[in-house]
A protein has these predicted regions:
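Cyclophilin-like peptidyl-prolyl cis-trans isomerases
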Residues: 1-184
């Protein structure tokens, strides 16, 4: 039987635009201002997953130098860094970091979003090649990449720890994500 897909059309968490995600990694902490007013579905989804501990102990599983560092795939949960690296490069048969997702998908929110700019330090919801297929994986943009502005939802920007973002490598871990702000 095929996988049942559902969209998070209306996450329970309603962003107010004042949320900040404190992403604690094995390399240090990154603080990200979330764009809750501009992309409420994406931020609501991210906040709910973070508050449920979904991202705890996941690894960053892909890096394209000067472009992106990708994390949030549940396939990497508790995998040692060397295994994440080996699996990401095809060295472990049957383990494919980057293919895992939460039990739902969400709609894209880049269209009409004036803040949807891939700048150095932007946090972006990753998705499959199909529209409206984002779930839980995200990436940090490591440079300006306007060619992606109309393809992926940018849901925040790094306000502290850009040096940490640039230091992240495949196998580095998300220890936990804490949401701060007036309604967190």
């Amino acid at each position: 039987m095929g996988k049942v897909e559902r969209f998070v059309a209306d996450p329970e968490y309603k962003p107010n635009g004042g949320e900040v995600a404190s992403i604690e990694t094995s390399k240090g902490t990154v603080k990200v201002e979330l764009f809750g007013r501009e992309c409420p579905l994406t931020v609501g989804n991210f906040v709910e997953l973070a508050q449920a501990g979904f991202y705890d102990a996941l690894a960053f599983h892909a890096r394209k130098e000067g472009s992106v560092i990708v994390g949030g795939c549940p396939t990497t949960r508790n995998m040692p860094p060397n295994q994440v690296y080996m699996a990401a490069h095809g060295g472990i048969y049957g383990v494919h970091p980057g293919t895992g997702e939460a039990e739902h998908r969400i709609k894209d929110e880049w269209e009409g979003n004036p803040l949807n700019k891939h700048l150095d330090g932007s946090i972006v919801m990753a998705r499959k090649s199909a529209p409206d297929s984002a779930s839980c994986q995200f990436y940090f943009s490591l440079s300006g990449q306007p060619e992606f502005d109309d393809k992926f939802t940018v849901f925040g920007r790094t306000v502290e720890g850009l040096d940490v973002v640039h230091a992240l490598r495949v196998g580095d871990r998300i220890e936990r994500i804490v949401i701060e702000g007036p309604t967190a």
